[in-house]
Design a protein with these regions (language model features):
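Carboxylate-rich, polar loop motifs that coordinate divalent cations or form catalytic acidic clusters
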Residues: 1-116
Length: 116
């Protein structure tokens, strides 16, 4: 191998090493979490959405949970109340442009309008 090739290879690896030495380390990300200890009704969450008021909605195995940033309100099926959600196993939650909260359950689709 010629002397010039050796110098080029040496410079290449030197530059590569310097790049690694001066590259920034990624910022450490710290996650916080909400669990049943903080009021979530069930720890398995299938779907999350946020309404226009800033409330977070969580679809779980134990109904739908609304979190206002401080407290949870839990919406569950009540066989004696025809206006409750269709089933406690809520697989998805979504808000629409009209402010309705749509909840997909094992027994059908429920919706709730916070405006009314």
């Amino acid at each position: 191998m010629s002397k010039l090739k050796k110098i080029v290879i040496y410079l290449f690896f030197l530059c590569l090493g310097m790049h690694s030495a001066f590259s920034e380390t990624p910022e450490q990300i710290t996650f916080s979490y909400i669990s049943i200890n903080e009021g979530l009704s069930q720890s398995t969450v299938f779907s999350i959405d946020q309404d226009k008021r800033g409330n977070m909605w969580f679809a779980t195995y134990d109904g739908v949970n609304k979190f206002d940033g401080y407290d949870f309100t839990i919406y569950q099926h009540d066989a004696s109340d025809p206006h409750s959600i269709a089933n406690d196993i809520a697989r998805t939650v979504m808000t629409d442009s009209q402010g309705r909260i749509w909840i997909g359950t094992r027994d059908g689709l429920s919706w709730y309008n916070e405006e009314k």
